[in-house]
Amino acid sequence: MKSLLRRCVNCGEYTLSKDKCPRCGGAVRVPHPPKFSPEDKYQKYRILQKLLMGKLPIRDETKERLLRDLTS
């Protein structure tokens, strides 16, 4: 079941609107984290994306090793 509740990025107001915040007109997002699964099928792709975007604070040699392991 998809979430109906959204939260404004600008003012933090909760709303049912899917497009924009009725209070300030800002963008809205789903405030809940994704469902957890121990058998995570997409973990490899999420880690690879974070590595390529530079969002994981790791050393360069570790990054190179992970990229080599994940792309093979």
Swiss-Prot record:
Q: SUPFAM superfamilies from the entry?
A: Nop10-like SnoRNP
Keywords (alphabetical) are: Ribonucleoprotein, Ribosome biogenesis, rRNA processing
Relate the protein's function as given in its record.
Answer: Involved in ribosome biogenesis; more specifically in 18S rRNA pseudouridylation and in cleavage of pre-rRNA.
HAMAP family listed in its UniProt record = Nop10
Mind giving the lineage of the organism this protein is from? Archaea, Thermoproteota, Thermoprotei, Thermoproteales, Thermoproteaceae
Q: Which organism is it from?
A: Pyrobaculum aerophilum (strain ATCC 51768 / DSM 7523 / JCM 9630 / CIP 104966 / NBRC 100827 / IM2)
What protein am I looking at? Ribosome biogenesis protein Nop10
Q: Which GO biological process annotations does it have?
A: pseudouridine synthesis; rRNA processing
Specify the superkingdom: Archaea
